[in-house]
Amino acid sequence: MGRISGLVPSRFLTLLAHLVVVITLFWSRESNIQACLPLKFTPEEYEKQDNQLVAALCLTLGLFAVELAGFLSGVSMFNSTQSLLSIAAHCSASVALSFFVFERWECTTYWYIFTFCSAFPAVTETALFIAVFGLKKKPF
């Protein structure tokens, strides 16, 4: 199986950092929603933007579940390619979402961060699940 390198704890920490920022965004999403709206907005417009951002954050949490399941089950824990991809994506997401929260970026920016930093690693994690359980290949 090979020895454990620094990739495993680094991947775990970047996953948790990204998760913490997403949870923080759940708590403080009001300022980001207002940044997405014109200066004068109706309660219906606010509710629509709030629902869209909550849906995006829930999708992100669902993809976290996929990635954490693969990581904690050992399917991708020692796969260095997946670990490097995950570290790069989640570290980038942590930094980008921190700016998203503090600089009050528009809500459409979240979807770009979601695509490259949450969806892409989850898709590759799913491909590893299929390779390991469906095709019976070794995970590393």
UniProtKB/Swiss-Prot annotation:
Query: InterPro entries given for it?
Result: TMEM107
> At which residues is glycosylation annotated?
79
Q: Which GO terms describe its biological process?
A: cilium assembly; cilium organization; craniofacial suture morphogenesis; detection of nodal flow; determination of left/right symmetry; embryonic digit morphogenesis; neural tube patterning; non-motile cilium assembly
Q: Name one Pfam family in it.
A: TMEM107
Q: Does the keyword Repressor apply?
A: no
Q: Please, which domain of life does this record's source organism belong to? A: Eukaryota
Where in or outside the cell is it found? Membrane; Cell projection, Cilium
Q: What's in the GO CC field?
A: ciliary transition zone; membrane; MKS complex
What residue ranges are annotated as transmembrane?
Answer: 7-27, 53-73, 83-103, 113-133
Give the bilayer topology.
Multi-pass membrane protein
Q: What UniProt keywords are attached to this protein's entry?
A: Cell projection, Cilium biogenesis/degradation, Developmental protein, Disease variant, Glycoprotein, Membrane, Transmembrane, Transmembrane helix
Annotated function: Plays a role in cilia formation and embryonic patterning. Requires for normal Sonic hedgehog (Shh) signaling in the neural tube and acts in combination with GLI2 and GLI3 to pattern ventral and intermediate neuronal cell types. During ciliogenesis regulates the ciliary transition zone localization of some MKS complex proteins.
Known disease link: Defect in TMEM107 is the cause of the schlei phenotype. Schlei mice display Shh-related defects including, preaxial polydactyly, exencephaly, and disrupted ventral neural tube patterning. Mice shown decreased numbers of cilia in several developing tissues and organs. However, nodal cilia appear normal in schlei mutants and subsequently, no left-right defects are observed.
Could you describe the subunit structure of this protein? Part of the tectonic-like complex (also named B9 complex). Interacts with TMEM237, TMEM231, MKS1 and TMEM216.
What is the name attached to this protein's record? Answer: Transmembrane protein 107
Q: Which organism is it from?
A: Mus musculus (Mouse)
Name the encoding gene, please. Tmem107
